[in-house]
């Protein structure tokens, strides 16, 4: 409670509260959320370089910050896969106009070497740094960044998949879900940082959005960051024809509890884990009904793509 009384809390600013923006002009916000608030603790990058959190990673920069750890079986792989898509969508902006910062909450395991391998698995490019350090320093950073949660203390897998977007020079901060739609996150950053991403169109020209059922929504929101159906492998395998290659019971169990199936050293799960650079499929906590609907929909999409025999042949050779 001592810190809460002595330091202003980030709540309004970090949530992008309009009232706070009106009360505190940009100069005042920048002073409020600057060197006196953010810790300048030392951290170590995936390349083994020692950096200081405020001076080297925040000061004078626009950033997107999240917490991860490489042994995570829940949201972390999905978070990182989604950010990888955002990185591609933003293109040259990353590393120039905005910097991605992913901090491990498992520093005893996540050495610079482990983080470097993890970054490579998810195709992290320039402008995206992965960090480790002392646990007490990481806890302080997480708290001051508004990324700490009560569930973190009980279980790392319970940590909140939040993404803190900030403009340090102006003192403006906003929290988003790190597992949101990548196009939405990219557009949110572009708007927040006032980038010109090309000519805007009138709403009158907008296409009518198609009705989306539960299964396609689940695939787009949970699976599409790593998988395609008929467009080749990504971070994970192409799912074209997977409902024909795998027994339905095995597929349902693997989708529902991939961490358990892998821990049992299932030969198919182990072969996929090794083939796709040891990227863990996250446990998305899907219900049996959601899993069943997803399998049916993937099968339907595979049949609709039936003309793509070249893709099906390639996928048939997978373990």
What are the language-model segments listed below?
Residues 42-62:
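A short beta-strand-turn-helix
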Residues 73-76, 163, 215, 219-229, ...:
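The canonical Cys-X-X-Cys-His
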Residues 80-124, 128-131, 135-140, 247:
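Structural microenvironment flanking redox-active thiols in thiol-disulfide oxidoreductases
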Residues 117-160, 268-275, 280:
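Short, internal strand/loop/helix patches
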Residues 228-260:
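Gly/Gly-Pro-rich "capping" loops immediately C-terminal to redox-active cysteine motifs
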């Amino acid at each position: 409670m001592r810190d809460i009384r002595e330091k202003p809390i980030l709540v309004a600013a970090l949530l992008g509260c309009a009232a706070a923006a009106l009360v505190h002009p940009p100069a005042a916000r920048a002073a409020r959320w600057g060197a006196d608030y953010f810790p300048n603790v030392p951290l170590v990058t995936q390349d083994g370089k020692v950096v200081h959190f405020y001076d080297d990673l925040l000061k004078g920069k626009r950033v997107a910050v999240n917490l991860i750890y490489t042994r995570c079986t829940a949201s972390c792989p999905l978070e990182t896969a989604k950010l990888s898509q955002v990185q591609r969508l933003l293109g040259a902006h990353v590393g120039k106009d905005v910097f991605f910062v992913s901090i491990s909450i498992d520093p005893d395991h996540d050495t610079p070497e482990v983080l470097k391998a993890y970054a490579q698995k998810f195709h992290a490019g320039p402008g995206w740094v992965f960090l480790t350090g002392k646990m007490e320093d990481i806890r302080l950073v997480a708290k001051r960044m508004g990324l700490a949660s009560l569930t973190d203390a009980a279980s790392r897998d319970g940590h909140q998949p939040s993404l803190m977007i900030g403009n340090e020079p102006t003192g403006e901060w906003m929290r988003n879900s790190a597992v949101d739609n990548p196009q939405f996150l990219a557009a949110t950053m572009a708007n927040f940082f006032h980038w010109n991403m090309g000519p805007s169109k009138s709403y009158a020209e907008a296409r009518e959005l198609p009705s989306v059922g539960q299964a396609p929504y689940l695939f787009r929101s949970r699976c599409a960051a790593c998988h395609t159906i008929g467009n080749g492998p990504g971070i994970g395998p192409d799912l074209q024809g997977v409902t024909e290659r795998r027994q339905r019971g095995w597929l349902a169990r693997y989708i529902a509890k991939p961490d358990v199936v892998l821990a049992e050293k299932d030969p198919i799960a182990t072969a996929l884990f090794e083939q796709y650079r040891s990227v863990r499929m996250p446990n998305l906590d899907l219900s049996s009904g959601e899993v069943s609907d997803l399998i049916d929909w993937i099968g339907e999409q595979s049949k609709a793509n039936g003309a793509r025999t070249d893709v099906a042949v390639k996928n048939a050779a997978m373990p």
